[in-house]
Every structure is written in structure tokens, then in C-alpha cells.
Amino acid sequence: AQLCESLGHRIEPVSLPVVLPELLDHVFTIIGANTRNHVDMLGRMRGFDVQDAELEARTRIILRDKGNVSGAQYTAAVEWIHALGRQLATFMQDYDVVLSPVLTREPARIGELVVPDMSLSLEDMIERSHRYSPFAALFNASGQPAMSVPLYWSAAGLPMGAHFAGRFGEEGVL
């Protein structure tokens, strides 16, 4: 933020109009339905079902908890995300860009975020990854233009980035 301000941009702290757990519940309803569809489609394409042993634990957890949602649940989740997009479009009328960190800390070590088995609940698995990277999911869901830019290096020599999200249809601003 200080770098942007030093380049002549006006910086203003804001709170985005979204509750992350509610967003992620709807996002994972959509992800679960799509994952089920893709796994089933792969089975049909190759002529035999995909076995659990062929899937990572993370995928099996998503399928276990969200892979059998109803069409009504899926549609409600999609409608909620569309409404969120409209809400964010209204919010963004007052701002050119929303700036946040890419991550809440240094990049994870290789394997640090691996889900080794089925013992985690979906909520715990989501919390674990989104505690580390909570900002991009909102703009991935809304479909707004956004970019992650490595702007500096940590003391350990790892890239640290800033996440810029813009208004719908204004990719050129980014």
C-alpha cells in the first residue's frame, strides 16, 4: 500500500461486503457438484468408474461432503455467487482497485498444505488453506479481473505479492 501511495495513488482502508465462511460454503457447493460431474464423466469416458485410490484426499473430502448436492442446492449457490458479483460491482463504483496481500504469510513449504487422509472435515480443510490465502477466493468467485504481483522479497528470499482486483470489464486498469 505504501508503494502505491508513493506512486501517487490514494489509499483508503475498506471492508469488503462479504462473509468468507458463507462465500466458501457456496463456492464449495459449486466445486463439489462440478467435481462429481468431472469424476463421473471421466469414468464414462474410460469405461469404468474412478476409484477412490485414484483421487487425492482433498478431492475425496470434497466429494464426500459436497459431491451429492441437489440441483436446487447447486442452483442456489450459483445464484448467490451471481448476487455477490452484483453487490461487488456496486461496491466497486467508488474504487478503481482493491489491494490486498496475496498470502497472509510467506509461501508455504512444499507439501505443507497437503491433505494426507480423509480425517479432516471439509470445513477444516477449507479453513486451513484459506487462513493462508483468504483474499483471492472472493474475486475468483465473482469473476472480477484481478492479478497477483510479486512486489518484494521476504527475509528468507521468497517472493511476496500484492493482489489487485478491479471493476468488471476494466482489465485495462490493472
Region locations from a protein language model:
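Gly/Ser-rich, acidic/histidine-flanked active-site/gating loops
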Residues: A1-A33, I62, G67-Q73
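Structural helix-boundary/capping segments
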Residues: A1-R10, R64, T75-E79, R86-A89, ...
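Generic alpha-helical structural context detector
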Residues: Q2, D25-G32, D40, S100, ...
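Short, surface-exposed loop/helix-turn segments at secondary-structure junctions
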Residues: D25, A108-S133
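Short, hinge-like loop/turn segments at secondary-structure boundaries
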Residues: F28-G32, P116-M118, A165-G166
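Short helix-loop capping/hinge segments that flank enzyme active sites or metal/cofactor-binding pockets
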Residues: I30-A89, P101-E106, I110-E112, P150-P159
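Basic phosphate/pyrophosphate-binding loop/patch that engages nucleotide-derived ligands
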Residues: M92
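Short, Asp-centered acidic motifs that coordinate Mg2+ and/or phosphate
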Residues: D96-V97
